[in-house]
């Protein structure tokens, strides 16, 4: 399929959970971050690419695997339907995603190379991460061993710590938004709900099972929500299911606010202690959100075997190495039908004004 077909793609704005939270005193010491400032990004056009496959779908679009025609490099192209973005009032989230990704550079965060829009779609050209979603590996295995969960938790902590150092709250931590690269290291993706913190934010957004109590109660929220979500994620990785679940969101919210956690018997004492301290309803007492910030999490006994200098340098041995046949391999992603997703009507010029700098 030729690149003009790109201009018709619609992007995977992941069905995610969105969360925010509040800020602790004192700047945490960061995981040493091999952050290399990217050179000025190249300028592309849609005609530079061939569309090869759809690797994700979402509320108002798709993510495509594309191949640059000349250099033969592979990228992920996120294509969002402007009419759907406007209808769902997601304009600010789209701008947030672009601004956050332009600001960050970290081994465990997805890279953004180029953005564009026409009269129907918004486009974000990002690195292609061929290992697929952590969610798929968790679903296939049922649950992870303690050492496997420890590895992913350590890399995620370094990513969260880096974002918080830049006053950015991620608000969408979940297995579906964690990709594995060809070596098995993580890449956080989908920054549609990430937000630069000026003060507390009040938006209710996110997947019910991962929402922090302060989000549900509309008390304003900031960094602490990411540490809450980490507690949920660790529980889910090691158990195979989240700690708070119900048939409907209201039931989930009630259980979150009650804060009662039923641990599977196989979890060891230290990880249960860590999860309890991350899932403290009072955010002022939540691990990661107190005076020492992320250091309190990294120094917890469950992480006693982790070399925190080595983590962001990608020196820890990944427990899962994806099976990848080549750079453009899509076998680790779901297969999506190439249906009539590209039927969005052109948007009037006045409605495009909000996207003029995209």
UniProtKB/Swiss-Prot annotation:
EC number: 2.7.11.1
A Pfam match: Pkinase
Keyword match Protein transport: no
Statement: the UniProt record of this protein carries the keyword ATP-binding: yes
UniProt source species: Homo sapiens
Catalysis: reaction(s): L-seryl-[protein] + ATP = O-phospho-L-seryl-[protein] + ADP + H(+); L-threonyl-[protein] + ATP = O-phospho-L-threonyl-[protein] + ADP + H(+)
InterPro entries linked to this entry: AGC-kinase_C, Kinase-like_dom_sf, Prot_kinase_dom, Protein_kinase_ATP_BS, Ser/Thr_kinase_AS
Region (Disordered): 1-34
Domain named AGC-kinase C-terminal: residues: 304-358
Disease: A chromosomal aberration involving PRKX is a cause of sex reversal disorder. Translocation t(X;Y)(p22;p11) with PRKY. Chromosomal translocations proximal to PRKY account for about 30% of the cases of sex reversal disorder in XX males and XY females.
Highest taxon above the source species: Eukaryota
Domain Protein kinase: 49-303
Function in brief: Serine/threonine protein kinase regulated by and mediating cAMP signaling in cells. Acts through phosphorylation of downstream targets that may include CREB, SMAD6 and PKD1 and has multiple functions in cellular differentiation and epithelial morphogenesis. Regulates myeloid cell differentiation through SMAD6 phosphorylation. Involved in nephrogenesis by stimulating renal epithelial cell migration and tubulogenesis. Also involved in angiogenesis through stimulation of endothelial cell proliferation, migration and vascular-like structure formation.
Residue numbers binding ATP: 55-63, 78
Record-given protein name: cAMP-dependent protein kinase catalytic subunit PRKX
Tissue: Widely expressed (at protein level). Specifically expressed in blood by macrophages and granulocytes according to PubMed:9860982.
One Gene Ontology molecular-function label: cAMP-dependent protein kinase activity
UniProt similarity note: Belongs to the protein kinase superfamily. AGC Ser/Thr protein kinase family. cAMP subfamily.
SMART domains: S_TK_X (SM00133), S_TKc (SM00220)
CDD domains: STKc_PRKX_like
Modified residues (Phosphothreonine): 203
Post-translational modification N-acetylmethionine, affected residues: 1
Disulphides: none
Subunit structure: Like other cAMP-dependent protein kinases, the inactive holoenzyme is probably composed of 2 PRKX catalytic subunits and a dimer of regulatory subunits. Interacts (cAMP-dependent) specifically with the regulatory subunits PRKAR1A and PRKAR1B. Compared to other cAMP-dependent serine/threonine protein kinases, does not interact with the 2 other PKA regulatory subunits PRKAR2A and PRKAR2B. Interacts with cAMP-dependent protein kinase inhibitor/PKI proteins; inhibits PRKX. Interacts with GPKOW. Interacts with SMAD6.
Major enzyme class: transferase
Active-site residues, record numbering mapped to chain: 172
Entry's induction text: Up-regulated by phorbol 12-myristate 13-acetate (PMA).
């Amino acid at each position: 399929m030729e690149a003009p077909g790109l201009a018709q793609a619609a992007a995977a704005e992941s069905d995610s959970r969105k969360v925010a939270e509040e800020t602790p005193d004192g700047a945490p010491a960061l995981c040493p971050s091999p952050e290399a400032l990217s050179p000025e990004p190249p300028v592309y056009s849609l005609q530079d690419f061939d569309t090869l496959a759809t690797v994700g779908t979402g509320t108002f679009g798709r993510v495509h695997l594309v191949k640059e025609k000349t250099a033969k490099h592979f990228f992920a192209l996120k294509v969002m339907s402007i009419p759907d973005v406007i209808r769902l009032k997601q304009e600010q989230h789209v701008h947030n995603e672009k601004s956050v990704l332009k600001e960050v550079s970290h081994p465990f965060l997805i890279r953004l190379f180029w953005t564009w829009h026409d009269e129907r779609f918004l486009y974000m050209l990002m690195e292609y991460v061929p290992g697929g979603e952590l969610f798929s590996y968790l679903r296939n295995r049922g649950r992870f061993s303690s050492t496997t969960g420890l590895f992913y938790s350590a890399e995620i902590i370094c990513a969260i710590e880096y974002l918080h150092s830049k006053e950015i709250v991620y608000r969408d931590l979940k297995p579906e938004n964690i990709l594995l690269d060809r070596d098995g290291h993580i890449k956080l993706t989908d920054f549609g709900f990430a937000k630069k913190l000026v003060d507390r934010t009040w938006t209710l957004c996110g997947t019910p099972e991962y929402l922090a109590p302060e989000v549900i109660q509309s008390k304003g929220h900031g960094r602490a929500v990411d540490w809450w979500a980490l507690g949920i994620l660790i529980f889910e990785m090691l158990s195979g299911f989240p700690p708070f679940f119900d048939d409907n969101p209201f039931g989930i919210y009630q259980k979150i606010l009650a804060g009662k956690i039923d641990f599977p018997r196989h979890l060891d004492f230290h990880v249960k202690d860590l999860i309890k301290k991350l899932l403290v309803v009072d955010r002022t007492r939540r691990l990661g959100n107190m005076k020492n910030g992320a250091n309190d999490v990294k120094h917890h006994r469950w992480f006693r075997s982790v070399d925190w200098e080595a983590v962001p340098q990608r020196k820890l041995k990944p427990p899962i190495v994806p099976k990848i046949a080549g750079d453009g391999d899509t076998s680790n992603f779901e297969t999506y039908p190439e249906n009539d997703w590209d039927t969005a009507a052109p948007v009037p010029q006045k409605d495009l004004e909000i996207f003029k700098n995209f």
